[in-house]
Regions:
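Non-heme Fe(II) oxygenase metal-center motifs and adjacent flexible, charged/small-residue loops
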Residues: 1-214
Length: 214
């Protein structure tokens, strides 16, 4: 079991955890990509963070990178299509997102990937979710953030050009914030959570995806 201590003052502990109405702000990007952002969508995110930190069977992984095997700089847990999610609040989030985006996505969100960033040394490198259908089809990835805010960076892929937007976009996400990456975002843009040299508390990222997208 991974034990994570979080200062109560840094978290939203005011209410029982529950997703609110979905009223995201959409930001169009180049090449048919877009992001939706809604701050504080999940109320009571601090209580949910504490439950997930304790209940989820977090795993440390190692992956092959070029000529060596390296530690993945975060803890992981994946819940497939038929798996029960570790907390009913996550089920409520997934179902509400599926209902809201049904007209655009045409299918429900099916899986949930959880990442635990223990401190500023944990990170995820530049990438797109292009394993499976995301490499050729428009799709969506919805991310709910819990715990200490960390920046999520987005930039156009070099292979498709900037489309007039050559700057890196930065979203500081935490405390129940929601970001949804849609359209062509996974194959025409990249995203990352960089390392931080500052003293940084833990963060949990919950990623909801449709079938066949990783």
């Amino acid at each position: 079991m991974t034990v994570v201590t979080v200062q109560d003052s840094l978290l939203d502990l005011a209410d029982d955890p529950a997703p609110g109405p979905l009223r995201p702000e959409r930001v169009p990007l180049a090449h048919g990509a877009w992001v939706d952002v809604q701050r504080g969508w999940l109320a009571g995110s601090g209580a949910l963070f504490a439950r997930l930190a304790e209940r989820v069977p977090w795993r440390a992984e190692r992956r092959r990178m070029y000529d060596r095997t390296v530690d993945v700089p975060r803890l992981l847990c994946f819940y497939g299509e038929d798996a029960d999610l570790p907390d009913p609040v996550l089920t409520a989030c997934r179902d509400r997102l599926s209902q809201h985006y049904q007209a655009e996505l045409g299918e429900p969100f099916r899986t949930a990937g959880l990442c635990l960033y223990r401190d500023g040394r944990d990170s995820v490198a530049w990438h797109g979710d292009t394993t499976g259908r995301g490499s050729t089809e428009d799709t969506m990835v919805a991310i709910v953030s819990l715990g200490t805010a960390r920046p999520l960076l987005l930039r156009p892929r070099a292979s498709v050009g900037t489309g007039g937007n050559d700057s890196t976009m930065r979203y500081s996400l935490g405390h129940g914030d929601l970001i949804v990456m849609g359209g062509s975002c996974q194959r025409t843009w990249e995203h990352a959570v960089p390392k931080s040299t500052r003293t940084t508390g833990p963060r949990i990222s919950v990623q909801f995806r449709p079938r066949g997208v990783r």
